[in-house]
Amino acid sequence: MSKVTPQPKIGFVSLGCPKNLVDSERILTELRTEGYDVVPSYDDADMVIVNTCGFIDSAVQESLEAIGEALNENGKVIVTGCLGAKEDQIREVHPKVLEITGPHSYEQVLEHVHHYVPKPKHNPFLSLVPEQGVKLTPRHYAYLKISEGCNHRCTFCIIPSMRGDLVSRPIGEVLSEAKRLVDAGVKEILVISQDTSAYGVDVKHRTGFHNGKPVKTSMVSLCEQLSKLGIWTRLHYVYPYPHVDDVIPLMAEGKILPYLDIPLQHASPRILKLMKRPGSVDRQLARIKQWREICPELTLRSTFIVGFPGETEEDFQMLLDFLKEARLDRVGCFKYSPVEGADANALPDQVPEEVKEERWNRFMQLQQQISAERLQEKVGREILVIIDEVDEEGAIGRSMADAPEIDGAVYLNGETNVKPGDILRVKVEHADEYDLWGSRV
């Protein structure tokens, strides 16, 4: 009787943004396909891979701590991801790391794994890797990464130095992946990249093919094709190019979710110029007004930075005035933090930490009030809700206005006879600053 060789076991730690999560999913899919077992504890693992984030100082610290924990608990560690682009910084703290690779270096990661934990002999038909690959999200939603890198050179950001210039995935490949996800039961696709609206710019929007039919490599064409899958499609990280106007009618027609995640960063033309971001606030306000006229249900999410070098009280007041006028639905705000390698570090007039904190608090207080007023407008209305969690007390879901992890929730107390992924019609009965409560219609 032949002896069964145990599968080699790999531990995996995934940190950072959804784009990093997709990279982790790809590496895990390859490992599973090759016969490796992915385990949830350090003790059982023959080796640990840590996929890091290096965007801001707190993320760097979290990544370094995760690497240290993996080394202490296991000892055999490979590091990849954004912080991997700064090998010297990692080696200085953790010299015992076996190998370090930068972001989206899938092949290199696998080569290193093969070197330290040789590839097992296995029957590929027994790997049981789902056709859509290994996913780290719940079964009913998934991230669809359409490109890598970014052509912008925002002074606060080091993503281009870590992930390079924009490289768009072939549109046929993207649409085939979307179809596999839907076939596997996914009800909501979240389109992500460093710059979603630039999709196809690097290939001059060339024509690709899907199911034998020509399709233009562009954000608008992609949205039109995804709308045919009959699921929720949500756009993230949309830079405010003029052609963003072209997706608003698709939202109004119900083809994709009326949700736009568009990081604006500031509202002072002077600060936007220092950031190397588009600077016409009046034009942006006019566009927002026009978008809402075309699609009244539109939810606008954005992120801003307070305390950027050189920001005066007058600049900050412009930002508050913009919030009052734009009345955005979902807003995130960060206190400026120097990132190693970012051009903004060299700018004069750095803002004191206590001023950053005070401005952040004023910003959040104002936006909290706006958010509460926007949500109060939904009380008494009927909305669609996708269910995320169910327990003995009821269900928690999200409306079309809520992306997972970053936005609000809809609470359905006593609604236990549903399952994650169900989409219900709900009457909104109560709202606070961020969340809604309601009952199934």
From Swiss-Prot:
Statement: the UniProt record of this protein carries the keyword Transferase: yes
Location of the protein in the cell: Cytoplasm
Ligand binding ([4Fe-4S] cluster 1): 17, 53, 82
GO BP terms: tRNA modification
UniProt keyword annotation of Iron present: yes
Domain TRAM, residue spans: 376-441
Cofactor: [4Fe-4S] cluster
Keywords: 4Fe-4S, Cytoplasm, Iron, Iron-sulfur, Metal-binding, S-adenosyl-L-methionine, Transferase
Domain MTTase N-terminal: 8-118
The EC number(s) this enzyme carries: 2.8.4.4
One example GO MF annotation: protein methylthiotransferase activity
Catalytic activity: L-aspartate(89)-[ribosomal protein uS12]-hydrogen + (sulfur carrier)-SH + AH2 + 2 S-adenosyl-L-methionine = 3-methylsulfanyl-L-aspartate(89)-[ribosomal protein uS12]-hydrogen + (sulfur carrier)-H + 5'-deoxyadenosine + L-methionine + A + S-adenosyl-L-homocysteine + 2 H(+)
Cofactor: binding details: Binds 2 [4Fe-4S] clusters. One cluster is coordinated with 3 cysteines and an exchangeable S-adenosyl-L-methionine.
Family: Belongs to the methylthiotransferase family. RimO subfamily.
NCBIfam families: 30S ribosomal protein S12 methylthiotransferase RimO (TIGR01125), MiaB/RimO family radical SAM methylthiotransferase (TIGR00089)
Name of the protein in its database record: Ribosomal protein uS12 methylthiotransferase RimO
Native species: Shigella boydii serotype 18 (strain CDC 3083-94 / BS512)
Gene: rimO
